Amino acid sequence: GYDVNSLCQQLEKKQLIGKDSARLKPIHDNLGSRRYCFSIYDWTSGFFPGNLWYAYQLTGNEEFKKEAVKFTNYLYPLREYKGTHDIGFMMNCSFGNSYRLCPVDSVRQALIQTADNLCGRFNPEIGCIRSWDFGKWNFPVIIDNMMNLDLLFYVSHLTGDDKYKELALKHAETTMKNHFRDNYSSYHVVSYNNDGTVEKKCTHQGQKDDSSWARGQAWGLYGYTSCYRESKNAEFLRQAENIAALIMRRVKTEDAIPLWDYDAPDMPQTPRDASAASITASALIELSTL
């Protein structure tokens, strides 16, 4: 079960308010001696408010609710941000959990506006949501984008409008077709030409273009689990199960915290990725219930 006291101590430690309203989200400590805050436009900005909402859900402690509201409100400008696919989980982790636990109309409207902006990054000719607006690619789509689909599913439920869900599932279908190899490992980046053909398959964070970046495999597993939950399409279930089987075969560590890339050398000094393990565990728990 949860060590609630330990979780609460970590969150209390990280409640820091900076002078710059755009740099208020604690990210990590350096040996416990220095605190870093990143911009609200960083892709992880919704995680800390989301953690506070979960702490409130677990404990009922009103202080966590108060802090969750405060740190969620700092992200309110993101409802108008159109510059990345990551607005999906930046807002869903924060505002999504806020509305789930304490529904108010302003939060609902922020979620709908964000979903509309995310839909604006969808290209119907390609069948995908564009990930980045930088770099050398024509229309880059990264496997991480599967995590942003939950916002579209959620807003479909909020509004009763299936257009969000249908767009998300189309993205998932295109990604399933082009991102995955025969063994169900995935490329990190697939870039498309304007006519929908593939321009390039490569990596931006993995060890090499044809390796299996650990967090990327976890993103895919989580995303296709969500897609099956929302659609009951057996193809998505098979995809999730096959990705899970790949991960189980490839994990080389006794504690199941993988090397940062499944093709990285299995040596003591090779970094490991606890976030990949956490995402995988969360996906497997949900997959076991479907």
Language-model segments: what does each one mean?
Residues 1-290:
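Glycan-recognition and catalytic cores of secretory/periplasmic carbohydrate-active enzymes
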